[in-house]
Amino acid sequence: LPLVVANFMRGGPGGGSIQPAQSDYWQATKAMGNGGYKMIVVSPGTLQEAVDLTYKAFELAERDRNPVMILADGCIGAMMEPVTLPEMKSDEQLEKEKQARKNWLVNGFKHREIGPVNIDLWGGRTSMLAMEAIAAGEKPGPRGLEESNRVSGELYERWAKEDTMVELYKMEDAEYVITGYGTAGRVAKSAVDALRAEGVKVGMIRPIIVFPFPYDAYKALDPKKIKFILDVEMAIPGQMVEDVKFAIQDRIPIHQFGRSGGNIVGREEIIAAFKAL
């Protein structure tokens, strides 16, 4: 079934603060839950982006019949900005979408018949063998479960090819790269502008969908041109930096700067960390 979950990260670990942080990245992108399932994870950097990505999250969840996570931080959850909402859908559009849901939506009433189950909705074959076992009052066996996992794997591979989203900012002539996501990425963007004003050729890579991670954006960097990468996060130790390292494979030096415990990373701090390298 489609599901959208919003995670507004706060300072941790354990019973930490309710201030902004980015300490749940690993949990959201690497350890989503038992059984090895995965989900698309979007991470807005502005309120407008939060609005747009929320709509997109529901579309993706319904498309794949799979959970989608909105991974934001306390800044996004607490601040106010003007936003533009998409146009209202017509009654005809709403009715068309409603009809499309009839092949998976259960009504919750025992005395009503459950509508036809479309086993082809999710990745094609899905767990037909498992469903047959359940219908017969049996537990799904290894054969059906393995088939389900294999089809899921095909879905995840398709995400990696078709569902990445990343912002490349002033990267055309960049000799240095600052990277970050969410609020840290937004602040990093202002640091890039300030450094550019000083004549430093620096650009930014900001993942907007953090799972699947946009590895290709980093793999495309020319090690003969880029002198180093500075990863900026509101997490100590850094977490997204591990994905950056995996993409770069030691071809370019990578450094990490972070704040934690509910402290919001600042533009001047990023600039100071950059100049110290």
What are these regions (language model features)?
Residues N7-G15, T46-Q48, G74-I76, I208-F211, ...:
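Acidic, glycine-rich active-site loops and adjacent beta-strand->loop/helix elements
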Residues I229-L277:
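Peripheral docking tails and interdomain loops at the edges
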Residues V4-K38, E92-E97:
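Flexible glycine-/small-residue-enriched beta->alpha junction loops
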Residues G14-A21, D52-Y55, M79-P86, A217, ...:
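Short acidic, glycine/serine/threonine-rich loops at helix termini
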Residues L3, A57, I178, R206, ...:
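Buried hydrophobic positions in well-ordered alpha/beta secondary-structure cores of metabolic enzymes
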Residues R65-E167:
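Conformationally flexible catalytic loops at phosphate/diphosphate-handling active centers
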Residues T164-K201, I205, F211-A217:
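Redox- and metal-dependent alpha/beta enzyme cores, enriched for Fe-S-associated oxidoreductases
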Residues Q19-G74, G266:
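Conserved thiamine diphosphate
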